[in-house]
Structures are given as structure tokens and as C-alpha cells.
Amino acid sequence: MAVDPFACPMMTMQRKPEVHDAFREAGPVVEVNAPAGGPAWVITDDALAREVLADPRFVKDPDLAPAAWRGVDDGLDIPVPELRPFTLIAVDGEAHRRLRRIHAPAFNPRRLAERTDRIAAIAGRLLTELADASGRSGKPAELIGGFAYHFPLLVICELLGVPVTDPAMAREAVSVLKALGLGGPQSGGGDGTDPAGGVPDTSALESLLLEAVHSARRNDTPTMTRVLYERAQAEFGSVSDDQLVYMITGLIFAGHDTTGSFLGFLLAEVLAGRLAADADEDAVSRFVEEALRYHPPVPYTLWRFAATEVTIGGVRLPRGAPVLVDIEGTNTDGRHHDAPHAFHPDRPSWRRLTFGDGPHYCIGEQLAQLESRTMIGVLRSRFPEARLAVPYDELRWCRKGAQTARLTELPVWLR
């Protein structure tokens, strides 16, 4: 293609990358050059994308990736071999179904709803601290680094029983996980070294994670980690501390990184006045749905690979072919949405792939939705006159490779 799907230009809020429209014009299955070299294929059609995401011939197994690819630097997640059965994003088939059975009870909507007050308290505390600091400095609060990522990180740690209680601890935990390559695609070296050089000190984080695991074994409190422990015991017969730590480490990153990216965009839309002051709960839910369609935090799915030679959309793919689904492109397809490139929270319905589809559908969707609605409620009740400190059109966002999209900053007057 003439356009690079993996380019990372700086964009404005009202400008979307042209590559997605170009993909649709090129066809339902488009061959591109992968970042690490060699061919890859992007699925651009909504129906075909859902077919691929549900097709057992397309798998997440990183062993099928081209030999030249280098782990997380190329958008892969390659777990420690003995721990692979405990990571949702790198196994398929019955191994994946077993992990879903272990994780699903922890994300039960009723169980999550019971924690709404605690989630609201975390949002309120963070926003109040930012407002107080803004009042002292006379400068607007910066909600990307100061809130959007810290909020979901502190929430998932609270739910798991990991005693990360303040933003400073959260930042340290994230830096260690990224340095170890446990932060998801394109997050770090993946070899136990910091991308800037050196070996990070993991002892403090390991202590916190083990504290959550040991508490779960004692059944001190009804945390997500306790649920994972009970279900893993039932499925595997026994589960080690290392295995539990690996599971909750994956949830910490999955539970905050993409959510943090999305919350930045959602906050921008709320603070730009797109949500009516008298919006009820249903209106807030519709607003969140439209933001999920319009601002997917990941423009493409994680890589999948053809487990065998397969023909899809009239295109024959060889065994091992790397495949992406164009989430943002399908979300803004004019065949499914009126005015697809406009933000309209009153749309009668949504068709989106923001959380994926098929067996690997995001297990944390309900938590992300709850965090989004709760955050809006806290912001509107505590700071009813909050507003952007810069014009909406001056906000900038960019992509980190093919896997995440995020605002660079979000200066706000919290009043």
C-alpha cells in the first residue's frame, strides 16, 4: 500500500488516520509490510473480521510468528514457556477455554458492581489531589499522566488485593513491568532489562504481588486473586505462587494500559461539553459506547497467525501468515454507521470491535465500562465546572506502533 499502517503521526482530535479509509478501498484483506519485515495481512471488513476472530485456524501462538520477529518489540507477547498455560493472550483452544473459566468469575458483572463505591472513591481521591495541586500552583491539572492511567491501575490493584495505594507506587510498578517486557506489546525489552539499559529492581513489586497471593491463599479478603486461586485449583489441581503472580501481573497490565488510553479520550469528549449536563445513566452509557466506537484505544488487534494454509476473503494465506484486524477501520465503516467519522453519542445502536470478538473477546469489558461510567459520575458531581484548559482542537494524540493510541496530554481546570 502507498500508506503505512504502522506510522505514528501526531494527530488532532478531529482528524483520523487516513490509512483506515485506504484499507477499505483496497479490499477486505490487504497485504502490508510488517514492522519487522516480511508480509502481513490486515482484515478491513467487519463481517470478515468477526469470522477471522472466531476461526480456530487463526491463533495467538507466538511460536508461529516469523523467526525474525523479536518479541514485544514487534507486538508479540512471548511468555515464559512454563507459564504459558497461565496467560490468556498467548494460548488457544481448550487451554484458552480453561483460562477463561478461571478468570470469568472474577469479572462477573454483579461482583464488579459491588465494588462501585470503592472505584468511585479512588477516582474522587485522585481528582481531588490533582485539583488541590492545581490550586496551589495556579496551573491546570494534567489528567493523562496524573489520572487516566493511575485510576484504572489503582482500581485493578485494589480488586486484586495488590497493595499499590498511591500514584507513586503505581508508577514504580509500571516501570518495572515494562522493563521486564510484561507491559504488553512494544512496552519494553522483554528480556529482563530496562530498555534504557540495566536490570530493574523487581523485589518491591514481587513482594506486593506475593502479598496478594498469600492473602488469597489464607482467604483474608474476597479479592479477584482469591477467585483466581480457587478456580485455578479446581482446574489444575494445584497452582504455584509463580503461576498466580503471572496471572495477576497480566491482569494488572491488561486492566490499566488500554483502559488508561481510552479514558483520556473519554475525558476529552466529556470536558469538551459533548455530554449534556442533565444526562441520565442511560445517556452516560450511550456516551461511553460512542466513545468506544470512535476512540478505540488500540487501532488493531494483537497479532494472530494462520495455523495452516487458509483462504479468507478470496486471499490465500500461507501457514504462519501474520494477521491483524483493523478495529478502528471497522468501527468507522460507513456501511454500518451514518456519519462514521463524527462523534454522535445519540446513535441508536453501535457495531464495534473495540473489545474484539470470538474466543478472545476482552474479558475485562465490564470493568472498563464500569470505570468509565463511574469516572464520569465522580467528575460531574465533584467538579461540575471542570473544563479543558486548551481548545479541544489543540489536543494532540499519537500512536505507539500499531497497538495503542493515546493523548499526549490533557490540561484541565478542575472546578
Curated annotation (Swiss-Prot):
Keyword annotations of the record: Antibiotic biosynthesis, Cytoplasm, Heme, Iron, Metal-binding, Monooxygenase, NADP, Oxidoreductase
One of the protein's GO biological processes: daunorubicin biosynthetic process
Pfam families, per the entry: p450
Entry keyword NADP: yes
Binding site for heme: C362
Catalytic activity: 13-deoxydaunorubicin + NADPH + O2 + H(+) = 13-dihydrodaunorubicin + NADP(+) + H2O; 13-dihydrodaunorubicin + NADPH + O2 + H(+) = daunorubicin + NADP(+) + 2 H2O; 13-deoxycarminomycin + NADPH + O2 + H(+) = 13-dihydrocarminomycin + NADP(+) + H2O; 13-dihydrocarminomycin + NADPH + O2 + H(+) = carminomycin + NADP(+) + 2 H2O
Cofactor annotation: heme
Protein family (similarity comment): Belongs to the cytochrome P450 family.
Subunit structure, as described in the record: Monomer.
Protein name according to UniProt: Cytochrome P-450 monooxygenase DoxA
Species this protein is from: Streptomyces peucetius
Record gene name: doxA
